[in-house]
Curated annotation (Swiss-Prot):
UniProt cross-references to PANTHER family, sorted A to Z: PROTEASE HTPX
Keyword Nucleotide-binding recorded: no
Protein name: Protease HtpX homolog
UniProt similarity note: Belongs to the peptidase M48B family.
Length: 291
């Protein structure tokens, strides 16, 4: 969940900066100078949409370290850190890519993998997770994060986000142009779009951005199932991954802990559409039914 939220927030911030810069440079005025040029608008939307998404990808590892306060283990300071590095080294070797950076951060049970490529990736685990699980369960979580890197999930998410960004920007500006023309009526101005265009384009971008996040989260949930299966394959057995999920979800107590509920690791109803992870019960069922 953490890597998805960080990526989406960074993507939103980058898109906002690029959009404001484009407006200050008069790009919108150019696009609407002789009526709305749909081809140019689509090209502009794709440039900003994919550009913002790939800039977010390039910044993902730095942003993750900064926002979580993660401490990269350069030299193991104790046996636990040595075990962490050795385990990630073995898992990444099995997965067929260079060993990623390994980091630890303070907080409730959590873990994430991020980075722009397999050779420039990061795996981080929280102190809360290390304290609440045995080593076999921690290894399963590490295998899950290594599987995310192996499957290229950050790049896949970047491409999906780029497509989503493109359509959000395109539709928002096209509809804003219609709204602006309606508000201005027969008024003819050579100075470009009016205030109605600026206000409505921002409103439409926010609205479509929220709706588009449902698409991104849908693909994220699918990738979680693949990462669970990948973890089982890397470890050669499914039981440890199932046990780790049970600890994370607190299934023994019959309820999710507050930390995981707030992270959207499981949910129902409309909120499930905005969750980056499937319900833990569904993930366990998928692992148990796998052949």
């Amino acid at each position: 969940m953490k890597r998805i939220v960080l990526f989406l927030l960074t993507n939103f911030a980058v898109i906002l900066v690029l959009s404001i810069s484009a407006r200050l440079l008069g790009v919108d005025r150019f696009l609407t100078s002789n009526g709305l040029n749909m081809g140019m608008l689509l090209a502009f939307a794709a440039l900003i949409g994919f550009g913002g998404s790939f800039i977010s990808l390039m910044m993902s590892k730095t942003m993750a370290k900064w926002s979580t306060g993660a401490r990269v283990i350069e030299r193991p300071g104790n046996q636990d850190e040595a075990w962490l590095m050795d385990t990630v080294r073995q898992l990444s070797k099995k997965a067929g890519f260079p060993m990623p950076e390994v980091a630890v951060f303070d907080g409730a049970p959590n873990a994430f993998a991020t980075g722009p490529s397999k050779s420039k990736s990061l795996v981080a685990v929280s102190t809360g997770l290390l304290q609440s699980m045995n080593r076999k369960e921690v290894e399963a979580v590490l295998a899950h994060e290594v599987a995310h890197i192996q499957n290229g999930d950050m790049v896949t998410l970047t491409l999906i986000q780029g497509v989503v960004n493109t359509f959000v920007i395109f539709l928002a500006r096209a509809l804003a142009y219609v709204v602006d023309n309606f508000l201005r009526g027969d008024e003819k101005e050579s100075s470009g779009p009016g205030i109605g265009y600026w206000v409505s384009s921002i409103a439409f971008e926010i609205m479509f951005g929220i709706l588009a996040s449902i698409v991104v989260m849908f693909f994220s949930r699918k990738r979680e199932y693949r990462a669970d299966a990948g973890a089982a394959a890397l470890m050669g057995e499914r039981r440890s991954m199932i046990d780790a999920l049970r600890v994370l979800g607190g299934l023994e107590a019959g309820a999710l802990p507050k930390e995981m509920a707030a992270s959207g690791i499981a949910g129902g109803g409309m909120m499930a559409l905005f969750s980056s992870h499937p319900p833990i019960e569904a993930r366990i069922a998928a692992l148990e039914s796998a052949r």
